[in-house]
């Protein structure tokens, strides 16, 4: 896959993840509760050892995991655009924080929902985790390539 196609694919995936996140934020409180409750029922039915899991914790984990994926994809996207480490880290974080704030703003207009500063912090922690995972994967990739004798100029 060419670098250009990779950028396009990552941009499309980022847009899909944002549509999923923001689409869930547009649900009313009742609809959102029904989705969370259905997922919790499925999880506890499939994995009985999760019977202790409260819906509140499931919702917070949902925020964290959605934004971890977003952070990973954003970091990968900016890795393809710019090779400077500051840009690779700062731009995905900035975009992720903006997405988190937008998410909570959308919720403020959804019936039965209200924005939460706690959710913004959970979302940003997810973005940071995604960026860290991508950074670790890329560092390991560079290390393996270096051991094989490839120069960094041939990477990406």
Could you tell me what each predicted segment is?
Residues 100-125:
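Interfacial helix-loop-helix junctions of multi-pass membrane proteins
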Residues 30, 77-85, 109-113, 136, ...:
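Membrane-interface elements of multi-pass transporters and channels
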Residues 16-21, 89-108:
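Small-polar-interrupted transmembrane alpha-helices in polytopic inner-membrane proteins
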Residues 4-9, 83-93, 116-117:
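Membrane-helix interface segments
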Residues 66-80, 127-142:
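Membrane-interfacial alpha-helical segments at the cytosolic side of multi-pass membrane proteins
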Residues 147-156:
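Short, charged juxtamembrane terminal tails flanking transmembrane helices
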Residues 2-74:
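"…centered on the first transmembrane helix and the immediately adjacent amphipathic helix/loop
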């Amino acid at each position: 896959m060419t670098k250009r196609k990779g950028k396009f694919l990552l941009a499309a995936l980022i847009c899909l993840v944002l549509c999923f996140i923001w689409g869930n934020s547009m649900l009313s409180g009742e609809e959102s509760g029904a989705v969370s409750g259905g997922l919790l029922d499925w999880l506890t039915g499939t994995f009985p050892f999760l019977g202790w899991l409260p819906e509140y914790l499931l919702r917070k984990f949902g925020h964290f995991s959605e934004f971890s994926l977003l952070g990973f994809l954003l970091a990968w996207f900016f890795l393809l655009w710019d090779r400077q480490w500051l840009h690779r880290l700062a731009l995905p974080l900035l975009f992720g924080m903006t997405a988190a704030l937008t998410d909570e703003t959308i919720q403020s207009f959804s019936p039965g929902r209200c924005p939460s500063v706690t959710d913004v912090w959970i979302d940003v922690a997810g973005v940071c985790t995604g960026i860290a995972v991508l950074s670790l994967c890329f560092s390991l990739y560079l290390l393996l390539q270096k051991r094989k004798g490839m120069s960094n100029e041939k990477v990406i």
